[in-house]
Amino acid sequence: MNNNFSRIITLLRKERGLSQKKAAEDLGVSQALLSHYEKGIRECGLDFLVRCGDFYGVSVDYL
């Protein structure tokens, strides 16, 4: 996984003016789990990568 994944998903969320809570809800995960992904505490699975790409309108490769 791209080492910048945490930074990228945080930036994409903030660029869209979304709170962590709202983004997590829309992505189907808890706010705590999204926070862990954004801080790099946990690595996500392929299914979450695909959902992020679809949600933010970017390719999985970009993430």
Language-model features and meaning:
Residues 17-36:
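Short alpha-helical DNA-recognition segment
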Residues 39:
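Short, conserved catalytic or interaction motifs in soluble domains
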Residues 8, 19, 45-48, 59:
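Residues that mark the N-terminal boundary/hinge immediately upstream of a DNA-recognition element
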Residues 14, 25, 54:
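Alpha-helical residues within the helix-turn-helix
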Residues 28, 47-62:
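DNA major-groove recognition helix of helix-turn-helix/homeodomain DNA-binding modules
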Residues 1-16:
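A short, Lys/Arg-rich alpha-helix, primarily the initiator
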